[in-house]
Amino acid sequence: VKRERFYSPDEKILIFQELFRRLEEDNSLLHSVSFILVLIFSGARKSELASATWDDWHGDYIELKEHKTDKDGKTRKIWLNSQSRSVIQALQGEKKKKTILGIKNPKRLWNSVKLACNCKDLRLHDLRHSFGTISTNAANIQTLQTGELMGHKSLAIMQRYQHIEDKTSKENIEKIGNEILSGIDLPTTYQ
């Protein structure tokens, strides 16, 4: 059974408020909160972010040599909007960890956040569905371009005939981040 679950606008606000409240109360949650925020803002897969190292980070994007859809030896570019970059920059003092986000899975925090926000059926992977939904519906980004940002290989045949410039991906990821952040005040940690 395929699930089609993404957060509602009201759930989005509650999730951000709860993440920021918890971070303010307990700074040891910085890596877990940051992981969830980059999932929300980038549309990346959890496994991609968990494995991303500081060497993979190139400012505007993370480039992975090994990733889920690597069947032809091509790297996967995860484009980062200004919101994602701010979150990652907040972790730069933590470079003693090999991976950017410093943890493999923020599941424990996520499970308690989604319960507190009364959206207990919302999985971490559903944040990726939310990204795609916002991209297509609110930010008016074409399906092919959303697929490119999310690393979907099912559009590979279309990509042979249509090419998306880096500039377009950079603009699109910024639009999505701004749309996700509408109505949300970031704490100073991420500004």
How would you describe each model-predicted region?
Residues 55-61, 121, 140-162, 185-191:
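Short, polar N-cap/turn motifs at the start of nucleic acid-interacting alpha helices
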Residues 6, 65-72, 150-175:
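Catalytic-site neighborhood detector that most strongly recognizes the C-terminal catalytic loop/helix
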Residues 29-33, 103-107, 120-139, 148:
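Short basic/aromatic active-site micro-motif
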Residues 9-14, 18, 42, 51-90:
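Conserved tyrosine-mediated DNA breakage-rejoining catalytic core shared by Y-recombinases
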Residues 1-46, 50, 128, 139:
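Basic, Lys/Arg- and aromatic-enriched nucleic-acid-binding interface segment
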Residues 10-13, 79-120:
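Active-site/catalytic core of tyrosine-dependent DNA strand-transfer enzymes
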Residues 70, 94-96, 156, 171-191:
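C-terminal secondary-structure termini that scaffold catalytic or DNA-interacting sites
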